[in-house]
Curated annotation (Swiss-Prot):
Gene: mnmG
InterPro entries in the cross-refs: FAD/NAD-bd_sf, GIDA_C_N, MnmG, MnmG-rel, MnmG-rel_CS, MnmG_C, MnmG_C_subdom, MnmG_C_subdom_sf
Protein name (database record): tRNA uridine 5-carboxymethylaminomethyl modification enzyme MnmG
A GO-annotated cellular component: cytosol
Keywords per UniProt: Cytoplasm, FAD, Flavoprotein, NAD, tRNA processing
Record-linked PANTHER family: GLUCOSE INHIBITED DIVISION PROTEIN A (PTHR11806), PROTEIN MTO1 HOMOLOG, MITOCHONDRIAL (PTHR11806:SF0)
Length: 638
């Protein structure tokens, strides 16, 4: 009791800011940079300044859906794309043999250089202050967040607060039968803040994630593995990157064996997942090796990728072997994998359990419904992945700054961005496991492509103040060049000359009978924009990004048009707003489950209400009638 009283008197006023960001992982970095760049004085408080933007799991950025999120972050004015472009050791475009909707960029990171560069960016950002400390409580008055209190008793005040604590909330590391309080990579956890959130009325859930062992590169026999080089073509996530890294490092592919599976099978009783020690729910789309062996028992082998963690370290990440089995079992497993028979274990794999908030407690702005002017982003919201965290962090930072500066907040729709899909899924449907973004979650994925993120979002980034005038002018010029070239190809008639017919035969197409518009010829599956340029050349050289857009927009014109028509229908539903003070108990005819879910989520529109699981079309019809009657009643009263 005396200790508590003494701590009350030890509190001191430490400063006031527009925005405070708690945590400096991938979500925290984007949130802080966005707020500061929008003109909000911003304080970042993090447990360890040496671990800013740390990658505790896979040393990579991007991949299916996730890579598109990184492009969206860049198109809006965020930092992740620029940072990985400066620090990667390898980059590859995935799914190049498939349609543009599922193509995605993936980069292997030099994880240590990535941290250094991101820290440097934060240190040099105007309006941004970095502080090492542990936030233990929020200052909440009348349901409004006014600031934070650190473990040293410092009270920092703000007009908005963003919490981006990752997997640190009551974090516990588990290896075999060993369990101890810890954040990722044996960092100190955040316990009191988690308890404080419960005191404020937040509903928390327990999630789990894991990481594989790291081994010494000098002890790997790479002759028994398959090399996985990066692309020869220069690649970049950021639209502003002009200098490309050409000195790439390869990754390597190997496989588990029947002996690996036997060892795992015989020691499943030692796995915390199956012994009952782990209570948290793990990620469905990133299962542990134990889980894979149990779920896919008939599969003779599983892929293992050996990924260097950086240029100046010998640590190699054994991707595909995520495990929390005891350390001695991990050593036995490694010895059965081709190329790893003599590999030295440098770090054991582990599972980590942590607290997350139930994300239906958030508005689409990522402000919490429980406490006003408090925002959350990243794994605290129940997601997995650096990219998902960064996307949320960017939106939370933008909206915290908007709230602090008295501006209108930003909500991205499902048809505008994968970030919009991600946030809408979280706040509307919630999640009972660590959420991973997939292309299949986006109903408008043909519109949400890797190649057109700038066309979708740069205008928005410019309006909110994250895109410079110079960049915006280049963007406008690109848009105009795309439209001009499309217009040219739609009016240019290609005649069936011998040269044209020969080219068409060479690519396996049917010869022309009459003249044809260049755009119509380009729609043929065997034809590319390069082919068209050979027979209908432009007067001036066409920028490769412009050429790519022209080809995709013309080739997929019909499909894109259908998607846009669906979006217009959705907009009508989105425009049917639901009043914040609506009383769902007063609406007769709603199913009990629908009533409960509507009261919990409190959707902002009919479209959002229709996406809530447990709310059926019949419930939506009843809700629409009720809203119409309310309008009629208001008009009559007036």
């Amino acid at each position: 009791m005396l200790r508590e009283i003494r701590r009350v008197f030890m509190h001191y006023e430490a400063g006031s800011y527009d925005v405070i960001v708690v945590g400096a992982g991938h979500a925290g970095c984007e949130a802080a940079l966005a707020a500061a760049r929008m003109g909000a004085s911003t304080l970042v408080i993090t447990l360890n300044l040496d671990m800013i933007a740390f990658m505790p799991c896979n040393p990579s950025i991007g991949g299916p859906a996730k890579g598109i999120v990184v492009r969206e972050i860049d198109a809006l004015g965020g930092e992740m794309g620029k940072n990985i472009d400066k620090t990667h050791i390898q980059m590859r475009m995935l799914n190049t043999g498939k349609g543009p909707a599922v193509r995605a960029l993936r980069a292997q990171a030099d994880k240590f250089l990535y941290q250094q560069e991101m820290k440097k960016t934060l240190e040099n950002q105007e309006n941004l202050t970095l502080l090492q400390g542990k936030v233990e409580k929020l200052i909440v008055e009348d349901g409004v967040c006014k600031g934070v209190i650190t473990h040293t008793g410092a009270r920092y005040y703000a007009k908005a607060v963003v919490i981006t604590t990752g997997t640190f909330l009551r974090g516990e590391i588990i290896i075999g039968d060993i369990k101890y309080s810890s954040g990722p990579n044996n960092q100190q956890p955040s316990i009191k803040l988690s308890e404080h959130l419960e005191e404020l009325g937040f509903e928390l859930v327990r999630f789990k994630t894991g990481t594989p062992p790291r081994v010494n590169s000098h002890t790997i026999d790479y002759s028994k593995t398959e090399i996985q080089p990066g692309d020869d073509v220069p690649r970049a996530f950021s639209y502003e990157t002009k200098q490309y890294i050409t000195d790439q490092l390869p990754c390597w592919l190997t496989y588990t064996t029947e002996e690996t599976h036997r060892i795992i099978d015989e020691n499943l009783h030692l796995s915390p997942m199956y012994s009952g020690m782990i209570k948290g729910t793990g990620p469905r789309y990133c299962p542990s090796i134990e889980d894979k062996i149990v779920r896919f028992h008939d599969k003779p082998r599983h892929q293992i990728f050996l990924e260097p963690e950086g240029r100046h370290t010998q640590e190699v990440y054994v991707q595909g072997l995520s495990t929390s089995l005891p350390e001695h079992i991990q050593r036995q497993m490694l010895a059965t994998i081709p190329g790893l028979e003599k590999a030295q274990l440098m770090r054991a794999g582990y599972a980590i359990e942590y607290d997350a908030i139930v994300p239906t407690q958030l508005w689409p702005t990522l402000e919490t419904k429980v406490v006003q002017r408090l925002y959350t982003a990243g794994q605290i919201n129940g997601t997995s992945g650096y990219e998902e965290a960064a996307g949320q962090g960017l939106i939370a930072g933008i909206n915290a700054a908007c709230k602090a500066l008295g501006k209108e907040e930003l909500i991205l729709s499902r048809s505008e961005a994968y970030i919009g899909v991600l946030i809408d899924d979280l706040v509307t449907k919630g999640t009972n496991e660590p959420y991973r973004l997939l292309t299949s979650r986006a109903e408008y994925r043909l519109l949400l492509r890797h190649d057109n993120a700038d066309l979708r979002l740069t205008e928005i980034g410019y309006k909110i103040g994250l895109i410079s005038q110079e960049r915006y002018e280049k963007f406008v010029a690109k848009k105009e060049a795309i439209e001009a070239e499309k217009k040219r190809l739609k009016s240019y008639i290609i005649k069936p000359t011998p040269q044209v017919q020969q080219l068409i035969r060479d690519v396996g197409g049917s010869e022309l009978k009459d003249g044809i518009r260049a755009a119509d010829l380009l729609k043929r599956p065997e034809m590319t924009y390069e082919h068209i340029q050979m027979i209908a050349p432009a007067e001036q050289p066409i920028d490769p990004e412009v050429a790519e857009q022209v080809e995709i927009q013309i080739k997929y014109e019909g499909y894109i048009e259908k998607s846009l028509q669906q979006v217009e229908k959705l907009k009508k539903m989105e425009n049917k707003k639901i009043p914040e003070d609506i009383d769902y108990d007063a609406i007769t005819g709603l199913a009990t489950e629908a009533r409960q879910k509507l009261k919990q989520v409190r959707p902002l529109s009919i479209a959002q209400a229709s996406r809530i699981s447990g709310v059926n079309p019949a419930d939506i019809s009843i809700l629409l009638v009720y809203l119409e009657q309310g309008k009629i009643a208001r008009v009559s009263n007036e």
